[in-house]
């Protein structure tokens, strides 16, 4: 029976950001302001469209977030690359949560589509990562599709998100 934790609070994901969750030299999340979600609401190594696992997370949007004043002055919009980065962050977190070793690095994505935007009027962003494959060899590689919703409407989709875990070579 799986006894892994299936959700994480903001305080718990900050522990991961400090490198204290999965052990030294292993996957960690960025710290604020680059951390792009406030909580992981559900994570499982089974289920999802491919029955290979999934992650669900949320980000509370407030008008005072750091990116709104500079992107763009007079026309504030969350940069699309931050939503994409959140998907990579969650993909890497999943690999560490599985117990895999190494530092997480985004490798690539297939196709990305933006069909809406996050503005200061948005209240909640939701993320979904649906795994297609986890490869465990010299390199641990997670491959997943992702989506992002703003107030319930899907506005970003990404296919074939790839994150690898890399172990440092001994000198």
Curated annotation (Swiss-Prot):
Q: Which domain of life is it from?
A: Bacteria
Question: What is the recorded name of this protein?
Answer: 3-hydroxydecanoyl-[acyl-carrier-protein] dehydratase
Keyword Transferase assigned to the entry: answer is no
Q: CDD domains attached here?
A: FabA
**What is the first-listed, main subcellular location in coarse terms?**
cytoplasm
Biological process GO annotation list? unsaturated fatty acid biosynthetic process
* EC number assigned by the record: 4.2.1.59, 5.3.3.14
On assembly, the entry states: Homodimer.
**Localized where?**
Cytoplasm
Q: Which controlled-vocabulary keywords does the entry list?
A: Cytoplasm, Fatty acid biosynthesis, Fatty acid metabolism, Isomerase, Lipid biosynthesis, Lipid metabolism, Lyase
């Amino acid at each position: 029976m799986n006894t892994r934790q299936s959700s994480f609070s903001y305080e718990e994901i900050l522990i991961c950001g400090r490198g204290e969750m999965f052990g030294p030299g292993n996957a960690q999340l960025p710290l604020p302001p680059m951390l792009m979600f406030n909580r992981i609401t559900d994570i499982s190594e089974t289920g999802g469209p491919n029955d290979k696992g999934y992650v669900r997370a949320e980000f509370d949007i407030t008008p005072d977030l750091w990116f709104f004043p500079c992107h763009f002055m007079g026309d504030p919009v969350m940069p699309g690359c931050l939503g994409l980065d959140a998907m990579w962050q969650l993909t890497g977190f999943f690999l560490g949560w599985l117990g895999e070793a190494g530092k997480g690095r985004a490798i690539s994505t297939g196709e990305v589509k933006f069909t809406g935007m996050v503005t200061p009027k948005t209240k909640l962003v939701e993320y979904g990562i649906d795994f297609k494959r986890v490869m465990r060899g010299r390199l641990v590689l997670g491959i997943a599709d992702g989506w992002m919703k703003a107030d319930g409407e899907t506005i970003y989709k990404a296919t074939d998100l790839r994150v690898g875990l890399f172990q440092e070579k001994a000198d």
